[in-house]
Amino acid sequence: MAQADPADRDRLIVALDVPSVDAAKAMIDKLGDSVGFYKIGYQLAYAGGLALVPQLVDAGKKVFVDLKLHDIGNTVARGVESLTALGATFLTVHAYPQTMRAAVEARGTSGMKILAVTVLTSYDDADLTDAGYALGVRDLVEARARQALAIGVDGLVCSPEEAAHLRGIIGPRMALVTPGIRPAGSAAGDQKRIMTPARAIAAGASHLVVGRPVMEAADPKQAAEAIVAEIAQAK
């Protein structure tokens, strides 16, 4: 479960939220050696993007497969077993006990790390109430984090607003991956619980997931390099 301190460049994970493999490859070419870690989520994965994972790994990059698996234990386990062959560094599952246990058991000794998603960064207390939860965001995130730690997942995905609190619970070595990262002056978009890169690192995040501020920048490579520089200064 230990998480080594990654190089500054590899603490930035760029979300390849594009509709095609060709668009992803074009962005990867633009970013060059400024980015060493990419996230593939639903949009790209369902457009054939999982085939990019071994290609990126062969090119010396790391990949975060963000599928947020959640199903009965056997189904999750079989899915995880299939995904281990791709060579990804991270895979997400939702932080439900049965789902987490199945994923941890199925990944075996593959080296792929299981990250549990606590509460989506687009949710706030009102959203949880609408969904029927009795707990607010902070309490639900903490409860799920403690369950994940007991089950043996390798890391958590949480809002940067919860990073400092969770780092105190899980200790210094477990991965803590935070989306909802917006450099100063960037629009929040559909994220409700956001933070700048420097503040998120200072709060205890091990990795930052950044999409639109890089992908939609006039100069994506320059935008990525600026975030990496901010990460380095915040340590």
Swiss-Prot record:
Binding site for substrate: 17, 39, 66-75, 121, 182, 191, 211-212
Pathway(s) it belongs to: Pyrimidine metabolism; UMP biosynthesis via de novo pathway; UMP from orotate: step 2/2
Annotated active site: K68
Oligomer status and interactors: Homodimer.
Catalytic activity: orotidine 5'-phosphate + H(+) = UMP + CO2
HAMAP family: OMPdecase_type1_B
Protein name: Orotidine 5'-phosphate decarboxylase
Keywords: Decarboxylase, Lyase, Pyrimidine biosynthesis
Lineage start: Bacteria, Pseudomonadati, Pseudomonadota, Alphaproteobacteria, Hyphomicrobiales
Any Pfam family hit: OMPdecase
UniProt source species: Rhodopseudomonas palustris (strain HaA2)
